[in-house]
Amino acid sequence: MKRATKQRLSLAAIIVLLLSGCGNVGKETKKQEQQVLRVGIDSELSTADVSLAMDNTAADVMSQVGEGLFSFDEKGEAKPALATEKVQPSNDGLIYTFTIRKDAKWSNGEPITANDFEYSWKRTVDPKTASPQAYYFEGLKNYRAIVDGGKSKEELGVTAIDDHTLEVELSYPMSYFQQLLAVPAFYPLNEAFVEKTGKNYGTSAESTLYNGAFTLEGWDGTNNTWSYVKNKNYWDQANVSLDKVDVQVVKEVNTGKNLFEGKE
């Protein structure tokens, strides 16, 4: 009971976070005639690696430059994103089979496949990764044995059946599972790019690959400014109104007020 309650609370918190991040950009988009938006946030970006993101800013950034099988609508409900549709689980509620969009691409033009999800999820639960996001996968088959060292990460309940079919097996029924899949921890990762980049993956804009509405530019891993630039390879780019969003870390209220009044 405690485990289920913890998961529901965590999911509720992340929904509020993602809606506050994505929602603000979306609402401003409708109001602005210009194609460039400037926003302020209250803390630095610690990482662009979905397996390691653990704070509010990182989760917000992930939601702008990445996308999973589902995303949250304005009411906080899960809607299909990289998955073509919501699905019904098996009769016992343990197996979900998702179809991946065939027009989904990474920012480098490579297709997004079911393997990108399998690789990402197994990387996150791997004890060697030491991911603060691993607990989100608690409901997947063999999760507990993997994090305890009794089983290999390869035995996690997720399998790429083919390039566009992903099968997920749970340890117990979770009525909110498809809602959970909108959380950044469940975003895909391009295995070839991550392995080539190694430990540098997600430490700067250049060492990260994107699949969301925007790509990240101008972030070197330590600076307080960066930009979201419209991803030309995003499958739904026709519905992305902004060309660019300039972000600046503003920790002091008065500083933010001065920047606003100075139109910076």
Summary of predicted features, one role per range:
Residues 18-21:
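C-terminal motif of bacterial Sec signal peptides marking the signal peptidase cleavage site
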Residues 33-43, 95-98, 117-120, 166-167, ...:
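Short, well-ordered beta-strand elements
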Residues 40-91, 209:
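N-terminal lobe/hinge region of extracytoplasmic solute-binding protein
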Residues 170-240, 244, 254:
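Gly/Pro-rich hinge or "lid" segments in bacterial periplasmic/extracellular proteins
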Residues 85-136:
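Aromatic- and charge-enriched surface segment that lines or borders ligand/interaction sites
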Residues 109-111, 116, 254-264:
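Short helices/loops that flank or line small-molecule/ion binding pockets
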Residues 23-26:
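Bacterial signal peptide processing site
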Residues 118, 133-192:
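Surface-exposed binding/hinge segments that line
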